[in-house]
Amino acid sequence: GCNLRCSYCDTAYSLSLTDTAEALTEEELLSRIHAFPWKKITLTGGEPMLHPVRHLCEVLGKEGYEVNIETNGAVALFQERPQGTFYTMDFKCGGSGMKERMLEENFRLLGKEDVLKFVVSSKADMDEMKTIIAAHFHKGEDPAFYVSPVWGRIAPADLVEYVRRERLSDVRVPVQLHKIIWDPQKRGV
């Protein structure tokens, strides 16, 4: 499940997965992971940091896996991260209704191997993103910065124009391709 209730949540079904989730022990999960040839794992959710994932990350890191933890920014990151672990961390701006839940102390734990992602729903959110980057990050070991529009609230072209106009050369604008290929409400893609 997820510990946030963002105004624009596009995966509300993940808030509580009691009817569809399959509970696995760490050993069962490792067995399933080992059945595949890939060495890159993403822990996502809901919110994976609500669960005891540190040991799993340690085991996978020692086995040569890269583990990407997609986290919502409202749960403390590991003070010392396991080998091979990196973060894609959201920062929920004001338009989400969850800004007060964000842990800005997580910023100091992000490095150049990580991603700080903003999902914006208004110009005010875009301005907030710009302010946060300027206040907390100073070139060098900074994470990559991604910004995506809330589907249906901001046109991607307007977001790209904002990034260009404000000269945010470190900010990338990835496209949620699954929302273009399939119906934006389709689950499991």
Language model features with spans:
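Disulfide-bonded cysteine motifs in exported proteins
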Residues: 1-4, 186
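Active-site beta-loop-alpha junctions enriched in small/polar residues
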Residues: 46-48, 72-74, 92-94, 119-121, ...
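Conserved short-loop catalytic and cofactor-binding motifs
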Residues: 17, 117, 147
